[in-house]
């Protein structure tokens, strides 16, 4: 239970700060930090402080201290298996999926076909929305630096692993954002019988 006080402070401060924001739908206990006693207690505290919203924690997986099942990077086959499993009743939201690095997003439509087919599946959060570059000047030119741009050659870095957004650091759209917009559009058109005026 070391750090329990810190867990409590973070949960209480988060809920007190954000409880009146209408866009806050779900409380999160954190990300990628294991599960155990502190997270069990933090979940109970969150439920005590706000009974109106669900609380989720990715590393709780199928344990009791999460109201949603929120995995990372499940394949479409894993997503459908969850949807078809009658023992799995919690709403499903991928807290990270469809890693948007480079010219990626392959398989995005397959995920959304499943999300729209099964009520238990609620969608997910694309990693990332925006490239994580920092504006700086190099050789007299303004650039968005990342990875190996800091320090001499050989300085430890994540290389281009931080450049994985739907939009660039300056918010210029990357090509795959258009696929996302199309697949997630509110209106779907089916059929092509124009003589009967059916679309």
What is each model feature region?
Residues 1-199:
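Extended substrate-binding grooves/exosites of carbohydrate-active enzymes
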